[in-house]
């Protein structure tokens, strides 16, 4: 963190004392939010929960924890589920992070990030897809900006023009949900121009032939139709990634 506080930690007080924090229960009635007393909210939620348990059994309820829980909150939440009578209690990481670990392990052979912050600082080209470290990971952003000061090119691919995009050399505005067609569109240009790293592929990659066959469907015209990014920009980004090394 280069000796500085992480913005997330510095802003932690806002979780409990921020002006925008919800301070009382609200209920949606007739399309409008109505304020409730704590007593009424507890009564309504409790009565409905007990009705569900009586009619469908305790295992009909699924308790989903949060990464924002403190240790004490997580402990109490698990105890509450046990008191309720079910083992159906899980954590959001099971949905978001476990799938990442499996995917990354299958792709890179290691179930975690494959490069360090020092690699980012020394990178000459960085691409961010659906990633906004300026707000989501401020400590990482410090290292990214050091890399930029050293001459690294930054490419940000996102439906929104984020704060990270404001620091980019190339902002690519894609339609939501078109990340994979975008990647295949880049690969189309890379294969078309022979920019792929054959040495790396032969030593560390299997199944590339199947990828090449699939990529043939993602012509510049098809990608522009699906993703919304013109051929010239797709070519420019692919060329930048292929020729500016090392990259991440």
How should these model regions be labeled?
Residues 56-60, 196-201, 248:
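Flexible, glycine/charged-enriched surface loops at secondary-structure junctions
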Residues 188-208:
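Membrane-interacting alpha-helical segments
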